């Protein structure tokens, strides 16, 4: 069961809603139950619930629990930046929205051959690893849905 607890996550992509707003009380109850059961991994992205996911995560998790109680993943998605200079301000806004000083995992989200070209032209990977060097990201990661062909050297 311990191995399962290490590998089971709480995704903030879909949360209980009241009208068009996150039901904060219910989400907090869910977060509390998740942590009480021994789970620690939380996942969000800037675009989830039109940005409300990160804010709900801050309200229900990061403002209520010490940083060592959870592992947090966020993602960098291609349609939120057009050039290299857009990445850091986006990243800093993600940290602020989530209420943390660093992310445990920062995923290069939805990698395909086309998106890989965009990430590469914007020096996204270099920026992500620089953020890691600065201690703002513990691990840079790539989703397992990544197309193999976009990583070939040809």
Each PLM stretch: what is its role?
Residues 18, 32, 82-154:
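Glycine/proline-rich, positively charged
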Residues 5-9, 40-41, 69-75, 102-107, ...:
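Structural preference for beta-strand elements that scaffold enzyme active sites
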Residues 1-70, 127, 133:
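N-terminal binding-site loop/beta-alpha segment at the start of enzyme catalytic domains
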Residues 48, 64-88, 109-110:
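Structural motif corresponding to the early beta-alpha repeats
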Residues 19, 46-48, 76, 143-146:
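Structured beta->alpha junctions
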